[in-house]
């Protein structure tokens, strides 16, 4: 899990900085999916300012810039119309290491329930 946390921190470092500095919303999704079409769907729905990165074979992180938690949940529901997956969503509020650790912990608990 530590490797994944560090990877997400590296990928989103600039976005975490912008969100904190300019007080703009930033939501992060951890998506678990075996569906091979997930990237096609994400690329169709994401904006040019959003960031997508595959962390492991089944785990994808998505940074939704200028997006609060409500809009992030709407985005997740739009994806669910096209592919099967589980996801953890949260809005970044300021402490990046703790934020990512909590996101991964919540994601692992979601996987145990699914």
What are these regions (language model features)?
Residues 1-114:
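Regulatory and interdomain segments flanking nucleotide-handling catalytic cores
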């Amino acid at each position: 899990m530590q490797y994944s946390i560090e990877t997400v921190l590296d990928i989103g470092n600039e976005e975490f900085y912008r969100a904190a500095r300019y007080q703009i919303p930033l939501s992060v999704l951890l998506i678990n999916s075996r569906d091979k079409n997930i990237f096609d769907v994400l690329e169709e729905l994401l904006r040019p300012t959003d960031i997508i990165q595959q962390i492991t074979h089944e785990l994808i992180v998505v940074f939704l810039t200028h997006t609060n938690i409500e809009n992030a949940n709407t985005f997740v529901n739009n994806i669910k119309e096209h592919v099967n997956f589980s996801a953890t969503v949260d809005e970044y509020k300021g402490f990046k290491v703790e934020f990512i650790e909590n996101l991964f912990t919540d994601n692992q608990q979601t996987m145990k329930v699914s």
